[in-house]
């Protein structure tokens, strides 16, 4: 079994659900305290043992490339005495992994975005980190999927039980318990209508795939929303290629395409921030007295 060392981050979305913040800035660059959202995704991959990361961009998103590149002018300024920590942080961003970029010339859906990564992943298994989904926790979700892949030898999906009223916004998996937080998956459906749901287990932003997915994607027709859905390709794999493993992951999920969840991410991660956490907690307590 090949070791999982590659990750793909589709980040070409327009971010229409969080306009006007994304009118001139990619959704992935929305800040959570002092880091853009996409940096949290890259850091999760690195913490999971990933060494090579492909970020899939759309038009006018070169700012993401700039963020993960060296910045000689800034580094020169930060070389002054007393700014060593900031310099170290900036250098670390550029050096944390081998990060590559490719443009998705047409935004035809998540499945199409993943197909763009074929030359990058080759014959290797790889993790897909959805660009909308920041998941915060001590145990990175990518690492949880990699462990499941090593145990069961099948593609994996990070799942969570969502309220039944919300299943139609996500996908629904047909699951059979294996042990602990692992389930066998032999079917799934994207954005099911009422009565089509298999369960209230939905994929929330992380999957681990094998190269066989590319042939399936090449023959996947547009589905929900008129887009090529990755879920449809994974459903085909689950039904006809030996099934998948669902991992009910641990970690707090934030949808960066949801304004309320963006604010929740700001507040909850600020409370855990090593520099401002305690001061922010005190400030928040005072503010809550006014509610």
Place the predicted regions along the sequence by residue.
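Positively charged, low-complexity intrinsically disordered leader regions
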Residues: 1-7, 279-285
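N-terminal glycine-rich phosphate-binding loop and ensuing alpha1 helix
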Residues: 2-79, 83, 140-141
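Residues at the starts of beta-strands that form the adenosine-phosphate
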Residues: 6, 51-53, 98, 125, ...
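Well-ordered alpha-helical segments embedded in enzymatic catalytic cores
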Residues: 37-40, 112-116, 233
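Residue-level signal for inorganic ion chemistry
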Residues: 38, 64, 117, 132, ...
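Conserved beta-loop-beta/alpha segment of the NTase-like Rossmann-fold superfamily
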Residues: 74-76, 84-175, 217-218
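Catalytic-core segments of class I nucleotidyltransferases/pyrophosphorylases
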Residues: 127, 146-150, 177-253, 259-282
